[in-house]
Amino acid sequence: MRVGLFAVGRLKSGPEKDLAARYFDRFAKAGPAVGLELARIAETAESRASNAETRKREEAAILLKSLAEGSVLILLDERGKALDSEAFANLLGAYRDQGKRDLMIAIGGADGLDPALYDRADVTLCLGKMTWPHQLVRTLIAEQLYRAVTILSGHPYHRV
């Protein structure tokens, strides 16, 4: 299953980008052994519209246009469902085992996500109740993707 990340806003050079890249690289190298492949990391600039609702709508339109037909869409939102790492790994494994070809994880802009995305999403997850800066969200989800691969493969990286 091809796994991608869609993010509103561009990650600038620096330690956050380097760390996210390190975990995405680990995921890309280890994932194929368990049927997961890093498809792409797509960034789009934040909308310059004058109000939040229009910005969210424009950002959602870009994401929805980029989704392959039949893709699984996972939204990251602080109001989403919290999963532990094993449950997240099992979720990815379940979509893979159902024969899903593409899965996209989406990080919204500073204004949040448009209702059209919630309507289209298969799952909305959170990385905890706290609000995180987008730079850290990318790093956290990259690490969790790598961790999911290690859980699915029985690698000792994940210890409980």
From Swiss-Prot:
Superkingdom of the organism of origin: Bacteria
SUPFAM superfamilies: alpha/beta knot
CDD domains: RlmH-like
Protein's UniProt keywords contain S-adenosyl-L-methionine: yes
Cleavable signal peptide: none
Residues that bind S-adenosyl-L-methionine: L76, G108, L127, G128, K129, M130, T131, W132
Catalytic activity: pseudouridine(1915) in 23S rRNA + S-adenosyl-L-methionine = N(3)-methylpseudouridine(1915) in 23S rRNA + S-adenosyl-L-homocysteine + H(+)
Recorded family membership: Belongs to the RNA methyltransferase RlmH family.
Role of this protein: Specifically methylates the pseudouridine at position 1915 (m3Psi1915) in 23S rRNA.
Name of the protein in question: Ribosomal RNA large subunit methyltransferase H
